[in-house]
Amino acid sequence: MAADERLGMGDKPVLLPGGNPQIAKGYGDAPVQAYIAAMPGWKSDIGRRLDAIIERTVPNVHKAVKWNSPFYGIEGQGWFLSLHCFANYIKVAFFRGAALRPVPPVASKSQDTRYFHIGEHDTLDEAQFAAWVKQASRLPGEDL
């Protein structure tokens, strides 16, 4: 394997253990779309749906890929959400998720953060997800 492939810089990104794409750090829509395109199997379709819901809900959302995960935020207010692929699900992290109503279902080691996991056969409640995104975008974000 060439060095650029190991580093995720070739035409086909490397999948890290658990299936998360290795995408170089970058700001804007392009690196996030590269991440979504590199999500394995069914996860790419869900990633596109999540990204579209986020864009519709927060029209001027700022995007970046950091630590091999897409981040979504508000300029000058920090990041409110990130995505990460695992073997059997996509983890959506709401950095101020404990303040959302209803609270996203999965707890975190961080008191403020809550997660929402989406598996291959799960039904995505788009209205609930959009409601969480809207609420999260109005809270102070994380400066990561």
Named regions from a protein language model:
Residues 2-144:
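Charge-dense, helix-prone N-terminal extensions
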